[in-house]
């Protein structure tokens, strides 16, 4: 080894002769004595080049610049009194160099490595190997390593075995577009990269493996956003002879144990509340609610229906919904600020937004007067009606009530989005808190108005509630599913369900989704045939590793916890991928590039 110790030296190492190797983090010339901060993965330590110890070392010290790779030998010493640095873990000690060797020089980096300054993300991704040298990215990857290591150890202790499944599989579209791989040996035929190992892990249950897991790479050719990548990693799990309670207990123990081991400084709930899908959408406007703050959606349809406000009366008469949320402390918003909120509501599909300001002074709701209320709706609503709206939405004097009216689904979506954005703007979320919950009681199917057909809410392998089986023939929209999601801080961090394990029931679900028998047999025949050989009852779940590590690290994009991510256009800026390949490779694959029509 070119080093005997890491740079994470402490007072316990005083008097020890060490050989270190790392990167020059900073260099300071103090009139004949040169100081550098030497950095490796474990830490940073000050190294002193003093001519009284070694003139040759001083000469090397004069050559050093930021990011040079250096080997240095010396003795760990206490720093002189008054020069200690309490901001560094190694700030009480230094290494006095007696031998030094430059292992490699370095060009000037395109951005500072030794400062956590904001750098354009495209530049960071192009030079990701330099970006990872920075403390924030390095810490994120270490958190990821610790999280994955805990997951493996936890599941091993629970009797699971890790089994790898193929990356080249058959294309059986499950929602998103597949990444296709043309076969050279079978012209005109294609493999697909797995969107998840869903069918493979179910086949492992048929095979009698009972408890399986895998740190699985998954691929989906879909539009990107902050928490999506074309390739991502999930902790894939499946168990035989279990029900929903077993799987939810496993998830609760896994996530709480993980936080306790990897980020014990974070606040988290050890028992996960259960929220029905219906309650989640009605109270929070989405099926992955952030429970770190209140601001629940309040239904005020009955108040609007009996009020003198024509807009509200019409919506209620047509079977629509009228709902409100309270923005705490925003009663003093001016016209421009309120207009900004109105435009935000319109962006998400609302025809408009009705703000009701309860004044700028904090106080009790019982003390509210009409003089304090500022709103275009004030002349149509009685004081008692406004007080009731305030009471339901949790508003008090000094707050701003925001009301949306229209189709119920739209109202929930708009206020749900506004709730989340206002929470960020008003600093209502504690970044150091993880608020877990289970979302349950999902419907099995949802109607696709555009395609005029039923879709799976989760995926087509999710089992229906046994009590709802008769409804599959008469009213599929009312069939409940045996699905369970884990949500945290406004993200779905794990989705799971008890699976269908009978061939006839699985075929029936496919029929409801619009597949004919020929399509079913061509795409899923292998699975249905396997179910005829004694498939056990089974269920599974797949926590998203990228997304949960993002929350553990306090980040807002999964790109911050992936070593070499794609950008939001699904491009790899470091390698320049996707890229053009030569004509011979194209011909060997028996494919032809067709120019896109303008």
UniProtKB/Swiss-Prot annotation:
Record InterPro entries: Aa-tRNA-synt_II (IPR004364), aa-tRNA-synth_II (IPR006195), aa-tRNA-synth_II/BPL/LPL (IPR045864), Asp-tRNA-ligase_1 (IPR004524), Asp-tRNA-ligase_1_N (IPR047089), Asp/Asn-tRNA-synth_IIb (IPR002312), AspRS_core (IPR047090), GAD-like_sf (IPR004115)
Keywords assigned by UniProt, alphabetized: Aminoacyl-tRNA synthetase, ATP-binding, Cytoplasm, Ligase, Nucleotide-binding, Protein biosynthesis
Localisation per UniProt entry: Cytoplasm
Catalytic activity: tRNA(Asx) + L-aspartate + ATP = L-aspartyl-tRNA(Asx) + AMP + diphosphate
Record: residues binding L-aspartate: 174, 220, 458, 499
Site (Important for tRNA non-discrimination): 30, 82
A Gene Ontology biological process term: aspartyl-tRNA aminoacylation
Annotated segments matching region Aspartate: 198-201
Superkingdom of this protein's organism: Bacteria
GO molecular function: aspartate-tRNA ligase activity; aspartate-tRNA(Asn) ligase activity; ATP binding; nucleic acid binding
UniProt keyword annotation of ATP-binding present: yes
UniProt binding sites for ATP: 220-222, 229, 492, 544-547
Enzyme Commission number(s) from the entry: 6.1.1.23
Classification via PROSITE patterns: AA_TRNA_LIGASE_II
GO CC, alphabetical: cytoplasm
Record flagged with keyword Membrane: no
Cross-referenced PANTHER family: ASPARTATE--TRNA LIGASE, MITOCHONDRIAL, ASPARTYL/LYSYL-TRNA SYNTHETASE
NCBIfam families per the UniProt record, alphabetical: aspS_bact, PRK00476.1
HAMAP family: Asp_tRNA_synth_type1
Quaternary structure note: Homodimer.
Function: Aspartyl-tRNA synthetase with relaxed tRNA specificity since it is able to aspartylate not only its cognate tRNA(Asp) but also tRNA(Asn). Reaction proceeds in two steps: L-aspartate is first activated by ATP to form Asp-AMP and then transferred to the acceptor end of tRNA(Asp/Asn).
Family to which the UniProt record says this protein belongs: Belongs to the class-II aminoacyl-tRNA synthetase family. Type 1 subfamily.
Protein name, UniProt field: Aspartate--tRNA(Asp/Asn) ligase
Gene name per UniProt: aspS
